[in-house]
Curated annotation (Swiss-Prot):
Function summary: F(1)F(0) ATP synthase produces ATP from ADP in the presence of a proton or sodium gradient. F-type ATPases consist of two structural domains, F(1) containing the extramembraneous catalytic core and F(0) containing the membrane proton channel, linked together by a central stalk and a peripheral stalk. During catalysis, ATP synthesis in the catalytic domain of F(1) is coupled via a rotary mechanism of the central stalk subunits to proton translocation. Component of the F(0) channel, it forms part of the peripheral stalk, linking F(1) to F(0).
Compartments reported by the entry: Cell inner membrane
InterPro entries reported for this sequence: ATP_synth_B-like_membr_sf (IPR028987), ATP_synth_b/b'su_bac/chlpt (IPR002146), ATP_synth_F0_bsu_bac (IPR005864), ATP_synthase_B_chain (IPR050059)
Similarity annotation: Belongs to the ATPase B chain family.
Pfam families: ATP-synt_B
Transmembrane segments: 3-23
The name this protein goes by in its record: ATP synthase subunit b
Gene assigned in the entry: atpF
Species per Swiss-Prot/TrEMBL record: Xylella fastidiosa (strain 9a5c)
Primary location class: membrane
Source organism phylogeny: Bacteria, Pseudomonadati, Pseudomonadota, Gammaproteobacteria, Lysobacterales
Length: 156
């Protein structure tokens, strides 16, 4: 065989192979590659969209948490203010009740002192009358007089 014919035959076979690959095999491969590229592009776009949505959700969570903390602090502050009001009201009520009880006790003490004075006056007057009776029943001499006065003083 001649080398030219071999080269020519191989060239024809190679050209036929190129034509078969270009017409029968290449278009489906290109189609599959393009579909795969499109799926990858869609996946990347979806991932980007997911990242954006995640960032937005995180921002919303931060805002919600901030609002919740502010509301919680506000509620706590209101509770402290209410507790302070209740304490102040209880203090005022306790002071009022203490003053009322002190006034009642003072009135009771004054009444008891007055009763004691009256009782003491009655007792002293009875003792004075008894002492005078004893003095009048006995002879009045200095020693007897002194003894009776000492007894009277001891009873008082």
């Amino acid at each position: 065989m001649d080398i030219t014919f071999t080269i020519f035959a191989q060239s024809l076979a190679f050209a036929a192979l190129i034509w078969i690959v270009a017409t029968k095999i290449w278009p489906p491969l290109i189609k599959v590659i393009e579909e795969r590229q499109q799926k990858i592009a869609e996946g990347l776009a979806a991932a980007d969209l997911g990242q954006k949505e995640l960032a937005q959700a995180q921002e919303e969570i931060k805002k919600t948490l901030k609002n919740a903390r502010e509301k919680a602090n506000e509620i706590i502050e209101q509770a402290h203010a209410r507790a302070h009001q209740i304490i102040e009201a209880a203090k005022a009520e306790a002071i009022t009740e203490t003053n009322r009880q002190q006034n009642l006790a003072q009135v009771e003490i004054e009444a008891a002192a007055k009763r004691a004075r009256e009782e003491l006056r009655k007792h002293v007057s009875i003792l004075a009358v008894n002492g005078a009776e004893k003095l009048l029943k006995r002879e009045i001499d200095v020693n007897t007089h002194k003894m009776l006065l000492d007894e009277l003083a001891a009873e008082i």
